[in-house]
UniProtKB/Swiss-Prot annotation:
HAMAP family: GcvPB (MF_00713). It comes from Thermosipho africanus (strain TCF52B). The gene is gcvPB. The modification N6-(pyridoxal phosphate)lysine is found at K265. This is Probable glycine dehydrogenase (decarboxylating) subunit 2. GO terms for biological process: glycine decarboxylation via glycine cleavage system.
Length: 480
């Protein structure tokens, strides 16, 4: 039910003071003036509160239960982050304020930038991108500017592995590049022979995630970096899986030239589902001049914004409207410290491998052996045996109060789950997940129709995904 459906004529939730201004005129063009009142819902304050409180109770989140969504790092977000972000000194400031009145905010962003550079092994960083994919596009635009600045106009291609995030080829195409996909080797990693076949002087960038989306560390990364640089290409790091290597190694040490981060993954800020988010981009020295404006700089003991960067790719958004997300990430890093971040990465890998062994007794692991922070399993055998698909198992997990893992991704594994437990989950939680998964597999063999009909206990049962994609409804249809 939408809020429009509980609207009643004459109900009021807020009252404006009387307008004492008698003579005024609205200096707007005629075509911008409304011809009728907006059709806002007429509801009381208690109606609004109850409506949205009831809706929120139907949500599932990391504060409710286990959320093993692979490649998403759904770790628990410590509440101290929220406490600090709610300080009035942070929450009540405005982008239009004079710089001298927001020195604390500018210092926080400057220090966050410096910390992220240290963590990733980059030389400079921008905090402007408002999400991971936005950062990804920013990084690709920087690479384009770099090649064009050298008069190198023949570089029109970006290489991505077949296990890459879908945003990688999308960002490359949006920036005007052709995308070359290379097949993974039998071990799930980049096949150097396949890479060598397509790597030439027309390639601008190689985009990689390390560990990759199969949860495997690209052990040949130094060789890949050398191959890229020998051909004049840049090496781009998708930071989706940075959590696994915190304190152990850094993208910059592996030979990457550009990094984008997802603060909502590694650095414990909320998954905004559309915003606000934050996708900082780090670069090596030779690319720093291309970073977007404005850049946060420190001049003596003062902080300000610098717009004077002639070779910058320019503006990629207007304001730091997602500042509170940066406050949360800053708080998390400061709270954890170097040792704490390293421990988090170690525990993420330990939890993933513990759960991998548990799950391997129930379903096949796509690429057996030690994984990093996540692993990919497949129920293809069960599907052939019973007709129960990964989607059915995912829906049945919801009945047991557990969010389903990522499914059907990467695309190179069939009927698969990508499972990432993160470091914040206990052994008890992992054991419980494995027990429930085993129970569902037994249900699938004994009563497949039961699993195919799931979920049964959720506020909304199976959605019509096809209709939602092809015939989306974006607005309420009023009855005339």
């Amino acid at each position: 039910m939408t809020i429009f459906e509980i609207s009643k004529e004459g109900r009021i939730g807020f009252q404006l003071p009387d307008n004492n201004i008698k003579d005024y005129e609205i200096n707007l063009p005629e075509h911008l003036l409304r011809k009728s009142l907006p059709r806002l819902p007429q509801v009381s304050e208690v109606d609004v509160v109850r409506h949205y409180t009831n809706l929120s109770a139907k949500n599932y989140s990391v504060d409710v239960g286990f959320y093993p969504l692979g490649s998403c790092t759904m770790k628990y977000n410590p509440k101290v982050n929220e406490k600090v972000a709610s300080f009035e000194e942070f929450s009540m400031i405005h982008p239009f304020q004079p710089h001298e009145t927001v020195q604390g905010a500018l210092k926080l962003m400057y220090d966050l930038k410096e910390m992220l550079c240290e963590i990733t092994g980059m030389d400079d960083m921008t905090l402007i991108p408002s999400a991971g994919a936005h950062g990804e596009l920013t990084g690709i635009l920087i690479s384009r500017a770099y090649h064009l600045s050298r008069g190198d106009t023949k570089r029109t291609k970006v290489i991505v592995p077949d296990s890459a995030h879908g945003t990688n080829p999308a960002s490359a195409r949006m920036a005007g590049f052709d995308v070359i996909e290379i097949k993974s080797g039998p071990d799930g990693r980049v096949d150097l022979n396949e890479l060598e076949k397509v790597l030439d002087e027309t390639v601008a960038v190689i985009m990689l995630t390390n560990p990759n989306t199969l949860g495997l560390f690209e052990k040949d990364i130094l060789k890949i970096a050398q191959m890229a640089h020998d051909k004049g290409a840049l090496l781009y790091y998708d930071g989706a899986n940075l959590n696994a290597i915190l304190g152990r190694t850094r993208p910059g040490d592996m030979g990457f030239d550009i990094v984008h981060l997802n603060l909502h993954k590694t650095f414990s800020t909320p998954h905004g589902m559309g915003g606000p988010g934050s996708g900082p981009v780090g670069v090596k020295k030779h690319l720093a001049k291309f970073l977007p404006v404005p850049e946060i700089v420190k001049i003596e003991d003062k902080y300000t914004l610098n717009y004077n960067k002639p070779e910058s790719i320019g503006f990629i958004r207007s304001y730091f409207g997602n500042f509170s997300v940066m406050v949360r990430a800053y708080t998390y890093i400061k709270t954890m410290g170097k040792d704490g971040l390293k421990k988090a990465g170690e525990m993420a890998v330990l939890n993933a491998n513990y759960l991998r062994v548990k799950v391997s007794k129930i379903m096949d692991i796509a690429y057996p052996g030690i994984c990093m922070h996540e692993f990919v399993s497949t129920c293809e055998k069960l599907t052939k045996e019973t007709g129960v698909k990964a989607l059915d198992i995912a829906k049945r997990l919801l009945d047991y109060g557990i969010h389903a893992p990522t499914m059907y991704f990467p695309l190179i594994v069939h009927e698969d789950f990508m499972i990432e437990p993160t470091e914040t989950e206990s052994k008890d939680t992992l054991d419980k997940f494995a027990q429930i998964l085993e129970k569902i597999f037994n249900e699938a063999r004994e009563n497949p129709e039961l699993v195919k009909g799931a979920p049964y206990n959720t506020p909304v049962r199976r959605l019509d995904d096809v209709s939602a994609s092809r015939k989306p409804v974006f607005k309420y249809n009023f009855e005339e």
